[in-house]
Amino acid sequence: MYEILNRINGPEDVKKLSLGELETLSAEIREALFNRLTKIGGHFGPNFGIVEAEIAMHYVFSSPKDKFVFDVSHQSYTHKILTGRKAGYIDDARFSEDSGYTNPAESEHDLFNVGHTSTSISLATGLCKARELQNGKWNVIALIGDGSLSGGEALEGLNVAGSEIRSNLIIIVNDNQQSISETHGGLYKNLEELRNSDGKSEHNIFKDFGLDYIYEKNGNDIGSLIEVFKKVKDIDRPTVVHINTLKGKGYERAVADKETWHWTVPFNRETGEKLVAGGRNYVSVTREYILNKAEKDDKFVVVTPNMPMCVGLSPADRVKLGEQFVDVGIAEEQAVAMASGMAKGGVKPLVITNATFMQRAYDQISHDVCINGNHVTILLNNSAFDGLTDVTHLGIFALPIFTNIPDLTVLSPTTEKEFTGMLDWALDVHTGASVILIPGGKILNRPRADGFDGAMKYEIEQSGEKVAIIALGDFDQKGESLAEAVEAELGFKPTLINPRVATLVDKQTLDDLKKNHKVVVTLEDGVLSGGFGEKIAAYLGDSDLKVKNYGLNKVFYDRYKPAELLKELGITNESIINDVKKYL
């Protein structure tokens, strides 16, 4: 199956192959990609569409002397296979050795840990400047595409590349006419015009930035790519190589439905059936809420930086929403600032994306929304501890990032009714800015108060004595389990509290605990430093209550296993009870 691939142990082996062997290699690499992705999932369409280009890059250039910078790096699988990491694709037992993104800890051929869009050109300009200062002689190649050009940092990078870099810089624009969902904005209309004119259109954004430009329409033809890369190798000025590729090439389903197959869970290759159980979850709950809300309220509008599928909004849903749906492309800053303008204009914007991406818009949330007191609601997915675990995609920093912005209410629901109630309150009752963290895991039905009425007060789920457990968001379930364990082992019923509002220090409830409690335990599925529990500890600092905070350390964890990390951090019933015993 891997006759040619078995001979490839590094880039130098690629250079020894004939054109026919390179074409065979591309087919074998797609088989290796199938082997991995059908079993553990990952970024499908981007990698199937870029196989030939990355083979040609390693055939023409000489990594690691020549520097490859991958934008997002979600499309770097072929590069990894060619740089000594094929076992992570052809040997099932070694899948875990290889991350889904470039990682310098894995290989000298990976320069950066990257997982967010639009950074490659900026990073590459820095490498170029460092090379100029040291009189170096090597190629710097940035590979960008898949919608990344719509990000402001990419345009900033192009601006600097065209004006400040006076040496070799090769920017490969992988134009597959697609982002995570469809592309948006005038920039992509220009790319379309360039494609339709074989790169000859007089309207050329890259030339306007002062960059040289070459177009290659056969972006999945190895021979054509080798020739165009040879033309620009060792060039003495910044140059854009615009290649036209087919996202998902090699799998008809991925070509026909590029959005669904951008990223996939494990699947059956023959049928395309996904092998992870579906069913109702918080993504589908969010989708239902948005569609119902839009139908009833013509002032409601959804704004997203190219992440509609993070809340399940299909292309058909987006068409149905019509003018009440705005996709700004991968541009979080634009999404938040635009939403602030919308709020000022009298409508009700709901901004949706993954938690890890919203950190880019910290300034807009603080400066454009909160200082101005504008009514913007931000809905973040994958902020949970057991959500995305790649080091570049962690949502565990959401609490310390957003709970320390003045005049921003951060809500951490624990049930479906609480979640939808918080959406109702944030959109229709509250007049300021809110962040709502979409719960992770399964939808659980619990016998507790329905919805959320906006009362800035903790919910007492269980009244007890001696020990109070304050469990935030997704760690509410751990709080319930801990309360049962305390009662079983220590013989008394502890108090269990669902704080609901991560930015709230409920002084009345905390003061009441002083009457018959000795220990307060806080649980949060985020980083402790600057987070929720520290605020509780600070308020109770001059009391006789002992406060123990449990959460995550300020660490860039990478592909952790949740259960193992909880044990390592002492966030288990046994460990917490042993701590509590010391203060009773």
PLM feature spans:
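Non-catalytic terminal/interface segments that mediate subunit docking, oligomerization
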Residues: 67, 251-358, 364-374, 471-473
